[in-house]
Amino acid sequence: MTASTMVTEGAAPAAAPATRTTRRRRLPFSAWHLLLAPLSLCFALPLVWLVLSSFMTNAEINRFPPALWPKGIDFGGYRYVLGNAMFPRWFANSCIVSTVAVGSNLVLGALGGYAFARMRFRGSRALLALMLATMVIPFQLTMIPTFLVMKWLGLIDTLGALIVPSLVTPFAVFLFRQFFLGLPREMEEAAWIDGCSRLRVLFSIVAPLARPALATVAVLTFLATWNDLSWPLIAINHDTQYTLQLGLTTFQGQHHTQWAAVMAGNVITVLPVLLAFLFAQRTFIQSLTSSGLKG
């Protein structure tokens, strides 16, 4: 009894250092949270002010210092935007361009990524390096050649001028390649033995396993095409072919700007982007953490 009591009494104080060590390990996380909370608030404030100002009048928005909270709920900006006869057409144009771009990048990007990941052909590495090099070329250097090509094809001032340059991007091909390199080959080899073609293997076996990559490419492509303003501003002249981003610029005149309408239109424009990210958030983050590690 005495010996066991002594052992028990001697072992009891050993738990205290472990607790102190755990607290020391948790302190940095708390410090990070305290640091990230104000930063998150700073990033969220512009979006919050955008929503609040969409319910203000033009006088409230133009006031200095600017109002942080509307005196009353005013739907004048939304009535102005939704009452514009061209607004449904602009919204439909943006949906068409974004949908076609997302679909083509998923299909063509997966085909290109699978070819670079699984097929070895002469010049594949050089072609991959050339494709990746195009990712660092700024748009300002390619917009004039792209415009001339679209003019030669007769697509200027049509939605085709917005769709064709975004049919497939090097980033989509690269992301699919990196993800496919991380998948095991055993299932593909078994399908080949059963007589499946490469296309059947890609779309029936590999593609279902690549849902994170598919979601990531879909979200990023949708964001790029939906929010694009610079290229439609160059390629589109007639208001019937305007996208939503380009149409919102018509609310800004030389001498007067309908700021309430601009804010309301931006809120409507942001909603599809937020919904797309919220629905694909889990698979989007999973793809970012799992791809890019293979070379």
Language-model-detected regions and their locations in the chain:
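A structural signal for multi-pass alpha-helical bundles of membrane permease subunits
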Residues: 29-295
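A detector for short, charged/polar N-terminal pre-domain segments
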Residues: 18-33
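Short, intrinsically disordered terminal tails adjacent to the first/last structured region
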Residues: 1-20
